């Protein structure tokens, strides 16, 4: 029998038997909200880079933080669902605006960095998400303590680098941060599943976790590509 004549059963590939139907429905809502966030964040980035109508700065950062706190403080219920979706969209929009300065920098160095960084982030995020979904339940939850410790060390090294000004430490922080965020995609995805299995159906807040992971991954990969491109240009001179 020719192996090329075999039919691929895509239904079997997308079947997560270890996840209950109610949690699968919850995940659909989470990723639908995530798609909404991506679209709105792209609009926010467009507003900063192209129209300049709203500029990234202290006000946009405080606005993003304020909307996230407001969203967190608003209880999840059917009555507050539309309000919280509006807060989520506002948070995503201002997050996109906040990416503006990094986008401007990359465009100045080489505009092709942006699609490369986005496609790379999308591939990384998708691969690690599928790994978490197909893996045995709770198999990646042990990463929580390790990831938080790594984040603490990264924050301390970043603060220390304000005084030392080491480019090597800055680059190391970017690469380590990229690896840590990949771990957070695994951890957060499985944590969302466990929360849903235990009755926490707040898909809007769960979306915030994944959206924040994606944006941080994108920012770090974008900066790594920008630095590499800048180094290449220096070598050519």
UniProtKB/Swiss-Prot annotation:
Q: Which Pfam families match?
A: Bax1-I
Chain segments annotated as transmembrane: 30-50, 53-73, 87-107, 113-133, 140-160, 167-187
Q: Name one GO cellular component term.
A: endoplasmic reticulum membrane
Instruction: Report membrane topology.
Output: Multi-pass membrane protein
Side Lumenal, residues = 51-52, 108-112, 161-166
Molecular-function annotations in GO: calcium channel activity; endoribonuclease inhibitor activity
> Where does cross-link Glycyl lysine isopeptide (Lys-Gly) (interchain with G-Cter in ubiquitin) occur?
7
Keywords from the UniProt entry: Apoptosis, Autophagy, Calcium, Endoplasmic reticulum, Isopeptide bond, Membrane, Transmembrane, Transmembrane helix, Ubl conjugation, Unfolded protein response
Q: Which CDD domains does UniProt cross-reference here?
A: BI-1
Q: Name one GO biological process term.
A: apoptotic process
Which residues belong to the signal peptide in this entry? none
Predominant location of this chain? endoplasmic reticulum
**PTMs per UniProt:** Ubiquitinated by BFAR, leading to proteasomal degradation.
Location in the cell: Endoplasmic reticulum membrane
Intramembrane stretches (start-end): 207-227
Which residues face the membrane's Cytoplasmic side? 1-29, 74-86, 134-139, 188-206, 228-237
As for family, the record states: Belongs to the BI1 family.
Assembly: Interacts with BCL2 and BCL2L1. Interacts with ERN1.
Q: Which PANTHER family match?
A: BAX INHIBITOR 1, BAX INHIBITOR-RELATED
Q: What is known of its domains?
A: The intra-membrane loop at the C-terminus acts as a calcium pore, mediating calcium leak from the ER into the cytosol.
What is the stated purpose of this protein? Endoplasmic reticulum (ER)-resident protein that confers cellular protection as an anti-apoptotic protein by limiting multiple stress-inducing pathways surrounding the endoplasmic reticulum and mitochondria. Inhibits the activities of the key sensor for the endoplasmic reticulum unfolded protein response IRE1alpha/ERN1 both directly and by blocking BAX/BAK binding. Modulates ER calcium homeostasis by acting as a calcium-leak channel. Negatively regulates autophagy and autophagosome formation, especially during periods of nutrient deprivation, and reduces cell survival during starvation.
Q: What is this protein called?
A: Bax inhibitor 1
The organism named in the record is Sus scrofa (Pig)
């Amino acid at each position: 029998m020719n192996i090329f004549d075999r039919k691929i059963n895509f239904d079997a590939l997308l079947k997560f038997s270890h996840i209950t139907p109610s949690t699968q429905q919850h995940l659909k809502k989470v990723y639908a909200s995530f798609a909404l966030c991506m679209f709105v964040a792209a609009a926010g980035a467009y507003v900063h880079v192209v129209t300049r109508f709203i500029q990234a700065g202290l006000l946009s950062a405080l606005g993003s933080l304020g909307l996230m706190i407001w969203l967190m403080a608003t209880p999840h219920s059917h009555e507050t669902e539309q309000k919280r979706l509006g807060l989520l969209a506002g948070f995503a929009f201002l997050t996109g605006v906040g990416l503006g300065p990094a986008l401007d920098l990359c465009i100045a160095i080489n505009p092709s960095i942006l699609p490369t960084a986005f496609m790379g982030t999308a591939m990384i995020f998708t691969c690690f998400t599928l790994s978490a979904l197909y893996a045995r339940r709770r198999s990646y939850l042990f990463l929580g303590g390790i990831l938080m410790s790594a984040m603490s060390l990264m924050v301390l090294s970043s603060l220390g680098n304000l005084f030392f000004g080491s480019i090597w430490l800055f680059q190391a922080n970017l690469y380590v941060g990229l690896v840590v965020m990949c771990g957070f995609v695994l951890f957060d995805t499985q944590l969302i599943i466990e929360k849903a299995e235990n009755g926490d159906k707040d898909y809007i807040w769960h979306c915030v976790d994944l959206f924040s992971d994606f944006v941080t991954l994108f920012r770090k990969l974008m900066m790594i590509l920008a630095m590499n491109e800048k180094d290449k240009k220096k070598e050519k001179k």
